[in-house]
Structure formats: C-alpha cells, structure tokens
Amino acid sequence: MFQPLRGIDDETEIAWALEWIIGLFESKGVDITPDIENTVWSALQSLASAPEDQRTLTGLSALLQDGDLRLALKPFTLEGAYGHILDGNSYALSENDTQAFEMEELMHSKALVAPVLTYLFHKLEARFDGRPTFLILDEAWVFLDDPMFAGRIREWLKVLRKKNVSVIFATQSLADIANSPIAPAVIESCLSRIFLPNNRAMEPQQREAYDSFGLNKRQVQIIASATPKRDYYFQSHGGNRLFDLQLGPVALAFCASASETDQADISKTIKAFGSENFAQQWLNFKGLEWAADLMSAEFNSEEYVPWLDAAE
C-alpha cells in the first residue's frame, strides 16, 4: 500500500501532489476549473500540517469542501475499490539498490495504471542521482498504451541518459512500440535492440514492424529462422549479430526459472531456508547438488571474501 501524499510538507512534493490529484479527478470525468484547483490546493496545504501518517487520501477527502470532488476521490480511498493500494499511512518503498514492482494487478485494472505508475515514476525519478541505473519496463505495452505515459517516457528517453540511466523496454510484440505515439522517440533513442526469434517475422504485418526498426529482409529472415529460447539478434550502430548466451545448467537454474511453478518453488525454498542460503538450496532443488557443494565449499573457505565486503 502506497502513501503518495506523505511528503507534501515539502514545496516540490505538494506541487507534484496537486498535479497528481488533479489527474485522479480528470480520470473520473471531473471538469477541472481554476476554482477546483484552488479547492484542492487549499486542502493539500491544510493536510500538509497534519502528522505524516495522516496525510492520506482519506485525510484529503475529509478536507475537501466539494461533495462532487469527494465522490470522485472515493474510489481511491479505503472506502473504494483502489484504496488498498493508494490510501496507505506509511512509506512502503524500500531504498534497496534493486527495486521491483509486480504489475499484474495493474494490467487488469486500467483505472489504476495511471495513478500508480505516475507515483512510482515520481519516486524513482528522485533516486536518479548519477549512479549507473537500469530502468526496466517489462510488458512495455502497459506504459505505451496510455497517452500520459507516452509523453513521460518520451521526455525520459531524452534526459535520463544524462543521469546515467539506461532505459530497457521489454515487450512481447514489436507492434506495441511500432503503433505507439512515441514510436519515433523510442526508435531514435534506443540505439541498441535485441530481437527474439519469431517464425512469423516474414509475414506482411509482422514485417512492417521490423521495417520500422530499420531491419532489412536478410535480417528479418535471420530472426525468422533463429532458435527460440536460445538465439538472440542484436542490432546497433556498431554492427548486428545473431548470438547465443550458451548458458550452462547452473546459469539456467537461475535465469530460466520464470514460470509460475518456478516462482512458487522459489518462495517455498526461501521460506524454508532463508534468503542467505537460497542459492545453494535452489541448486539442490534443481538436482545440481555438485554445484551446491562447490558453492558451499567456496563460502566456507577461509580465503573467501564476499564481493560486497570486497567492494567496500
């Protein structure tokens, strides 16, 4: 559960919160006028003086004098369908170097996509401080299908490189990008591309999408004849090549464990043995006892220095 209004005692945050709340109202068909903006601004200013755990959407609703605005906000409070995600009273995001968000629920609720992702993008943007960062947008169609996010991503692609952030789009279909209003920006800014095998790549409709990425007939033929789950076609200004990662059984035990069954087994393994012992126990579970034994022997060696400690 997120608490988007927690930091509104800060000038930058309250300005962002005004824009975000106005977006919620617009999504519910509210005609935004200067009077409505003033009403929301006054309510936010009043809420900013409350303790942090009271700066919630429910708290904001109580301060709004307009009944129509309270009604429009209700779905996003604890009284509505989406309050369990957006009406929290504590900070739910960690400051870990790796941060992941499960988007499956958002994919099934279009009304949640814009407010939740706007908030998450806002928090992530604040963390981009020049350190090398990957921003991976999996199932990219969720972002590309919304005009508001199309505009945001177009902006990000232009400026994030200056902050040492690499944006990675992942999508099951090139048409998601080719048919998006930000297709020119994506194609122009994403100079390195990796295409997965597609035995239908030479079909006319599919071919159009590949054409938009500058692939010629021979390159599309290579993609069409490549081996699924093994081959990848890399395209860049520096050259193009079909490659195979040649992952062995140990690497595949981790990199290829993406099914729902695998994820359930991973959760069970962590619950039973803890996260610190996960790698060894997962190798055992996958029938790679020899690799688990090697890892155990290495970890128990007096000469072993964890890479995190070594980095310090």
Which role fits each region the language model picked out?
Residues 174-312:
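C-terminal regions of RecA-like/P-loop NTPase motor modules
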